[in-house]
Amino acid sequence: CIVENDFIGSDEPYVLVAAINLTTFPRSLEVTLYGPWSDVDAGEVHSTFKIPPNLPQPIVDVLKLVLVVRTPFWGLDNKTAAAIAKPEDVVFLAAVLERDDGKPEAARALVKGSLTATLASGLNLKRDVLVPKLIHDMDSALAIPAEAPDLGFWSPDDRIGGTLELKLRARDLSQAEAGTAQKQLLFRGDSGEYRVNFILAPQV
C-alpha cells in the first residue's frame, strides 16, 4: 500500500485477476479473488499465504477462513499449474478495489459474467482488438457496484484506478521456467495507490 484510501481507519483492499486462455475454443476464462486484506495502512506490505503441502484438509479449511491464501489464477482451475507456451496465448487483467460495505465475491461474479459475454460475442477477434474490449468491459462491470450511491449507513467499494493488463514477455516465461519471475502493476486513483506483485513460477 503506497497511499491508503480511508481517511478514518485502515483499508481493506482486494484484487481481482481475470485469466483468459486464447488457445481453446471457445476461449476459456476464470476470475480469481484475492482478499480482502484487513487493517492495511500506507507503507505496509501484505501478501498471500502459501499453504504448505500435505496439510490435513481441516487445517487448510481453517487457514482459508483467516488468511488470504495463495491461489494460482493460471491454470484456470485455481489448483493446477499450467505451462504457457507463448505470451500471446493468454490474457491477464487485474483490478484493485477497497472494500467498504460491498461484497467482493459479487464483484468477482459481475466481472466473470461480463467477460464471458465479451468472449462469446468476440470469438473471431484478434488479440490486439480483444484485449482493449475486455479491459473496457471489466471496468464497466466494476463500475456497477463501485458507483452505487453512498447511503451514509452503506458505502460502495472504491476502485483504485482502472483495470490493467499484466503483460508477459518471452523472457518472463523463461525466467519462470528456470525458477521464479516477478511482475508489478501500479494502481493509482483518487481513492488510493497500490503496487501489486505477481509471482510467475512452475508451481506457486
Predicted segments, located by residue:
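N-terminal amphipathic/basic membrane-interacting segments and domains
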Residues: 1-204
